[in-house]
């Protein structure tokens, strides 16, 4: 979810994602912080503003600036500073406080904090015509998603299906996942290619987010240059439930490799 829209200068944010549990707060508020830093020699003025967002079926962030949803964190958020200048590679700490958190609904609430440079930079691009110039307007914008879980929240991941099909001389896997409960599920994991009970190949799967009560589908190409024979693809994914416990989701699918693949 950490996104940069054509950054002109190298800007780093730590952490790039914030997840909070309101049930662990001793009061009616939560406080968190993140730091922003640019390269040495860069002087950039930034402004901050929050937006509500939803999670799409592809695990991406979809901004919804004018949302009145109950799970919108913006009405509860205060942040300091709301504008600052990065200079000489020195980091800037931004503090975010959420008040009246007992009014938040059960489950997950969210917002994204955008950091955007105040003044756009102009870049002249080379042109084949000396009488015509092309000007590019460049802005840097970073987004830090912030999630707050509160009350009775549940995180349940499900591995619904794993299929392998032949497409254009490639073997393609299609993976279907879903999440129950009222809070997102974030998973990571690996895939194994097995033949005759022996591990042939192993590779990392993309980490992704499934929205609460949402579905997610992913597809990819299996490793090539496999010998002919019968294989098993075993996918092992891990996520954390509402108690912070690691849970595994495992699915297997058989496939064959022939001379035509």
Predicted regions and their residues:
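Short proline/glycine- and polar residue-rich coil/turn motifs
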Residues: 84-92, 207-216, 225, 242-245
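A short beta-turn/strand-edge loop motif at beta-sheet boundaries
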Residues: 41-44, 181-186
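C-terminal segment of classical bacterial N-terminal signal peptides
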Residues: 1-7
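Surface-exposed binding patches on compact interaction domains or structured appendages
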Residues: 12-14, 42-96, 195-200
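Terminal connector regions
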Residues: 47-54, 99-147, 226-261
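Short edge beta-strand/loop segments characteristic of extracellular beta-sandwich folds
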Residues: 33-37, 97, 172-180, 221
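Ligand-binding face of N-terminal immunoglobulin V-set domains in extracellular IgSF glycoproteins
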Residues: 31-35, 78-116
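Beta-sheet-dominated interaction scaffolds and their linkers
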Residues: 9-42, 83, 157-170
């Amino acid at each position: 979810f950490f996104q940069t829209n054509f950054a002109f200068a190298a800007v780093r944010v730590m952490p790039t994602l914030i997840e909070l549990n309101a049930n662990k707060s001793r009061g009616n508020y939560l406080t968190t912080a993140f730091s922003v830093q640019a390269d040495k020699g860069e002087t950039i003025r930034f402004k901050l503003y929050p937006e509500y967002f939803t999670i799409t079926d592809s695990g991406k962030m979809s901004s919804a600036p004018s949302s009145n949803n109950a799970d919108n964190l913006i009405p509860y958020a205060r942040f300091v500073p709301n504008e600052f200048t990065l200079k000489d590679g020195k980091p800037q700490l931004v503090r975010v406080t959420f008040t009246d958190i007992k009014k938040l609904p059960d489950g997950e609430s969210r917002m994204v904090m955008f950091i955007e440079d105040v003044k756009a930079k102009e870049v002249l691009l080379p042109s084949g015509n000396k009488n015509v110039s092309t000007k590019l307007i460049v802005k840097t914008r970073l987004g830090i998603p912030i999630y707050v879980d509160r009350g009775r929240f549940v995180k349940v991941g499900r591995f619904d299906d794993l299929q392998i099909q032949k497409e254009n001389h490639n073997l393609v896997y299609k993976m279907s996942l879903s999440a129950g409960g009222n809070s997102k599920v974030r998973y990571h994991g690996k895939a194994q290619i097995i033949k005759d009970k022996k591990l042939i190949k192993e590779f990392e799967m993309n980490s992704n987010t499934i929205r609460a009560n949402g579905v997610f589908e992913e597809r990819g190409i299996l490793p090539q240059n496999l010998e002919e024979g019968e294989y098993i693809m075993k996918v092992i994914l891990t996520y954390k439930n509402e108690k912070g416990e690691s849970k595994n989701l495992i699915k297997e699918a058989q496939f064959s490799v022939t001379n035509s693949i």
